[in-house]
């Protein structure tokens, strides 16, 4: 049966996402209830709700100004059904309100703090979509050590930057190697993996160059450890 023509739909202004946010939106399970923590302009929940991809959304932010922008985005694209909350992390979100949690666009240490402050996220009933901007290796290690297991990891290139996105669940930690901690847990087969490894290696060499300028004798040990990690990443890159 052909679809009926709907003039109202044709006039609807559609939100378009940049590649990083598009990947995050694509990884959200259909029909679920989502909490977007640190929502900023609210682009991901608005995009998902506009297309009927999710049942409900909570958009939270620690800042009043970003939350105001998120409300304006929803109004601009005529999207309802999003609950906007001013709070730090998951402080104002109850476990029974959501099935999926998106935390993106912030440092890995901040994401770690948010999850540490909400231990209920580790019980296995929630899919966490995480996109750290910094300290990626620290977040991978913390997740592994704190009973979260990786179900998916993907890379996306946005404005000449490579970003990793993890999908994790609580319940049983995934033991990871140094190569996985620094280079990715589930990226074998990703077309961007070789470029990502090269980027990670270059950043480690930059850190080592800075450490070598210091007279602190402890830095010599740090440099040796980082050099060992670089060798492992280079070996991995050579297998791709």
Task: Identify the residue ranges that each predicted region occupies.
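S-adenosyl-L-methionine
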Residues: 10-32, 46, 68-95
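Short SAM/SAH-binding signature in class I
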Residues: 98-105
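Conserved class I S-adenosyl-L-methionine
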Residues: 31-40
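Class I S-adenosyl-L-methionine
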Residues: 11-17, 91-92, 109-240
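Conserved SAM/SAH-binding beta-strand->alpha-helix loop
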Residues: 60-65
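Conserved SAM-binding loop of SAM-dependent methyltransferases across substrates and taxa
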Residues: 41-54
